[in-house]
Amino acid sequence: MNSIEFPLLDQTTKNSVISTTLNDLSNWSRLSSLWPLLYGTSCCFIEFASLIGSRFDFDRYGLVPRSSPRQADLILTAGTVTMKMAPSLVRLYEQMPEPKYVIAMGACTITGGMFSTDSYSTVRGVDKLIPVDVYLPGCPPKPEAIIDAITKLRKKISREIYENQMSSQRENRCFTTNHKFHIGYSTHTGNYGQELFYQLPSTSEIPSDTFF
């Protein structure tokens, strides 16, 4: 059997009692139950049609495509990501429960592809928006390469510790930002195209029932 199909064993007794850690057992249980969210935008996504057939047998890895990010733990991005689609992609990623993983499929997803030089509306790499676990280059990648990327992700899951993954994701860049709101009063100057000037009131002028 493959080494990634079983949790790491700490100790084995003569009575066939196996002891291991809770993290290893959790990682092992997730290996055969990855539920991907397929985020395809262009031609690379057509290669998934070959995986569904009997020749490559997409289901043998326990992959069940989901239409809701709240039921998925893997998002597979394939195709060009534009600036207008970036907030939607980040929102889908943030709605996925922990632990979650990302596979970037295709040259357009990884670097922007042929649109990376002179396009004003293309994201130069999906890793600028969400953290990526496995990069899958190609234009488009073959179905065998997709299976190899899934195998590499399964090996990564079998060796990782949940706490380490949580700390590493907090260090990655993210598209969303924390906004700070202040109460202010606008002063119109009467000139067209001129910005509003805001004056912060003193604390005595703020009502006691105001919430931030």
Curated annotation (Swiss-Prot):
The protein's GO terms of the molecular function aspect are:
4 iron, 4 sulfur cluster binding; iron ion binding; NADH dehydrogenase (ubiquinone) activity; quinone binding
The residues listed in the UniProt record as binding [4Fe-4S] cluster, with positions renumbered to this chain, are 43-44, 108, 139
Main EC class the enzyme belongs to: translocase
Write the Enzyme Commission number(s) for this entry.
Answer: 7.1.1.-
Q: Its principal location?
A: plastid
Entry keyword set = 4Fe-4S, Chloroplast, Iron, Iron-sulfur, Membrane, Metal-binding, NAD, NADP, Plastid, Plastoquinone, Quinone, Thylakoid, Translocase, Transport
GO biological process: one example: aerobic respiration
Q: How does it sit in the membrane?
A: Peripheral membrane protein
Query: PROSITE patterns, per this entry?
Result: COMPLEX1_20K
Q: What does it catalyze?
A: a plastoquinone + NADH + (n+1) H(+)(in) = a plastoquinol + NAD(+) + n H(+)(out); a plastoquinone + NADPH + (n+1) H(+)(in) = a plastoquinol + NADP(+) + n H(+)(out)
Protein task:
NDH shuttles electrons from NAD(P)H:plastoquinone, via FMN and iron-sulfur (Fe-S) centers, to quinones in the photosynthetic chain and possibly in a chloroplast respiratory chain. The immediate electron acceptor for the enzyme in this species is believed to be plastoquinone. Couples the redox reaction to proton translocation, and thus conserves the redox energy in a proton gradient.
Its subunit composition reads: NDH is composed of at least 16 different subunits, 5 of which are encoded in the nucleus.
Q: What is this protein called?
A: NAD(P)H-quinone oxidoreductase subunit K, chloroplastic
Task: Say which species the protein is native to.
Answer: Glycine max (Soybean)
Q: Which gene encodes it?
A: ndhK
